[in-house]
Amino acid sequence: AVRALFYYYIMDMYGRVPIVTSYEQPQDEVVQSERSEVFRFIVNELQEVAELLPDERSNKMGNYYGRVTQPVVHFLLAKLALNAEIYCDDNWTDGVPQNGKEIFFTVDGERLNAWQTCIKYCDKLAEVGYRLEDDYSYNFSVHNENSNENIFTIPLDKNLYAAQFWYLFRSRHYNHGGALGGSSENGTSANISTVLANGYGTDDVDARFEKNFYAGIVEVDGKPVMMDNG
């Protein structure tokens, strides 16, 4: 399951990547596979291991904290099905999109299209108690281990992980970090398509936007934080 998870990451980022399943494979035999082939490899691998994994919450303290469990696999399969039109398109510059109704999966013996598959795996998550939280912010609070929405979170328990807030300062702009009296790396940034998708700059901004991003003018002690060039 972990191998499939990391193949998902690189397929999503790069598209065509080599499929290597043995450390003994000679380097000169490592060649790129089409994105659709990598997609099917990931789906098949996740479906094969799903029934072997415990039906436990990965975001709660205990033996399975931070580990890939069955709900994590179901969540990832739902995500793969939801984006199947993209992942099954090997000629993504030809202007001819794929059709999710014509991309099929076998789930519990049923032949389902991509949209039906996504719903099926989301239903599996709902059956074991996952649901959207009434307060979106709670998912990101310090004590969010009882969130009914979080499925696969970064383990940051203060008693187990000394680097628990690194991801916070890594996401801030250098000047924000300095103005707030802390550190920063300017690592995670939103691109134009992200802010537009959230309605930034319009009268219909997604209510979650301000909870996920620093945007616009940020003030500290009543003074705007400026770029180095003003």
What are these regions (language model features)?
Residues 1-169:
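Structured, solvent-exposed acidic/aromatic patches
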